[in-house]
Amino acid sequence: MRVSGASWISAFLVAATLGVAAWAWMTLPPGAGVPTHYLGLDGHRHAGVSREALWAIPFASAVVTLALTFGPRFTGRRVEAFAPELYGMILISVTGLLLVTEATLVARAFDAGFNVMRPVAMATGILLLAIGNYLGKARQNPVVGLKTPWTLADPRVWDKTHRFTGRAMVIGGLALIGLGLLLHDGTLLGLAIGLCTAAPMLAGALRSRTLAHQT
């Protein structure tokens, strides 16, 4: 079973994420850790720090890499003939984003005033740019892409929808990078990440419906 170059790059990014976590584990002073916020069984919100939470993102990154590398092979759904560049870019971009997220959380553990959302927003913008640049090259397939009833039914609708959505993702990525540079409020940046990520996909789904009805 041949492992792609994208999977090896992703594995390196996973190792780097694990290295950041290990370094923080050994370097952080006693009692320090990643800030945590959760809703308890008592119905109240709780806040604290957790040293063990340092390992959550490296674990998630490893799971993503293994799932995206071997999942399609075990299910018999190969992507090499349909969207090899897009699939590889998704793999690299997601693990890269998780590396940035881990690094920012570690920085926050050392400095309570560090703004986690700004670098995460800009990294998400880069992810949208990277994936959007390759989205239009994906051919119709059941594994990766914007799968709506209309794109799966008509290759022409698939191609036009993915070119449109790819351009929208590039615009969203550029906007998110700019907002990450300009804004400081974490709530606003969180909303911007959600909007810039979801809007291109929603616009693409609506576009596929319009294209299908034009045929």
Where are these regions (language model features)?
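Membrane-water interface of transmembrane alpha-helices
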Residues: 24-30, 63-75, 130-146, 206-211
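Active-site and channel-lining beta-strand-loop segments
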Residues: 24-55, 144-153
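Terminal transmembrane helical module of multi-pass membrane proteins
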Residues: 141-213
